Amino acid sequence: MGNHTLLKQINKLLVLKTILDNKIISRTKISKLVDLNKATVSNLTDELIKEGYVVEKGYGKSKGGRRPVLLQVNKDVGSIIGIDLGVDYIHIILSNFVGEVIFEEYANMKIGEDKEKLLRLLFDLIEKSVKKAPQTPKGILGIGIGVPGIIEKESGTVLLAPNLKWQNVPLRSIVQQKFNLPVYIDNEANAGALGEKWFGEWGKVSDLIYLSVGIGLGAGIIIDNKLFRGAAGFAGEVGHTTINFQDDVCSCGNIGCLENFASERALLSVIKKLVKQGVEDRYISWENVDEITPSRIIQAAKEGSRVCRMAILEVAEKMGIGVANLVNIFNPEMVIIGNKASFFGELFLEKLREVINQRSFIAQFYNLKIEVSKLKDRAVVLGCIAMVISDMLSFPEYA
């Protein structure tokens, strides 16, 4: 793709995103917002209308002269499937073209599930979604999948996903051959960051870090409204930064990784450590410690469990140290805590904010915002919807 064609595709996506963000808008207003001349905006919107992605929707008010024609994204042009392929779950949604959910399912699975069994579950969920898809002009536009690991985006290959025990899995090819639909693969934290930018409350924030906290830990980094990928496309693996030189071996094979101290798995590990040390209460004991779940820990903490409160505070402190390092390096306007940690509660968030502000060298000099994702555990799946739209329009062979 030549530079001129690439620039045109980027501008086209920018125009579409602007229409999506504003719900209904005139060409003149788009031109002002995206800093493109009126003729360019007119040509790009005409293409989007011709392709069916945008529709004209009546007239706006005029201060004199002709009333402007208003534009709106055609939400019913096609459906999109978004998938968060977690370590112990698969979360799938079918949405229309503006991210409104048509069908949603969440399936649990055991950690370290056999790859073939996992793929069968994935196929079953995709087939369910396909059957639920309404009749639209373009049908199902594509499938976006977020995976916790190192992804070669161009080929859609999972190079390494330690918590899934996957290596060199050509996931895009596998799913594409099965369903004969365009498939787009990315790291799930990157997808979460895209979800926040496209569909979240803080979409207009130009520099942010989305922290995806589940069994593992990853970061999607947005700099100047663009996803920061690094030289090879692998940026954001904050869970595998070293904060301890004498810890147990991580799933990646290294020692002292942050996700060993700051994740769902870490929360469960701290609970067991505290009980072993003799710190018990009426909620947690040796008899039930192996059955405790993260959601039960959060609930018990709210009800006054000493063990659960201590565990949440310890994990928040370790995570705060890791995030403070990211803040020092990237100087974001906002840090968004997402995925499973979006349910960790106020006790966790207050401690996290306290530690980040104490530990970050630069946080004291500006108004850093640290918030829990309002999209909760939907940020990744919605980011996968955004991934399909943006990749589809940036690479015309999938349009």
UniProtKB/Swiss-Prot annotation:
What's the protein here called? Xylose repressor
UniProt DNA-binding region: 27-46
Q: What does the record give as the function of this protein?
A: Transcriptional repressor of xylose-utilizing enzymes.
Keyword flag GTP-binding = no
Family of this protein:
Belongs to the ROK (NagC/XylR) family.
Q: What organism does the record attribute this protein to?
A: Caldicellulosiruptor bescii (strain ATCC BAA-1888 / DSM 6725 / KCTC 15123 / Z-1320)
Give yes or no: UniProt keyword Nucleotide-binding: no
Which key words are in the record?
Carbohydrate metabolism, DNA-binding, Repressor, Transcription, Transcription regulation, Xylose metabolism
InterPro entries in the cross-refs: ATPase_NBD (IPR043129), ROK (IPR000600), ROK_cs (IPR049874), WH-like_DNA-bd_sf (IPR036388), WH_DNA-bd_sf (IPR036390)
Q: Can you cite a GO biological process for this protein?
A: D-xylose metabolic process
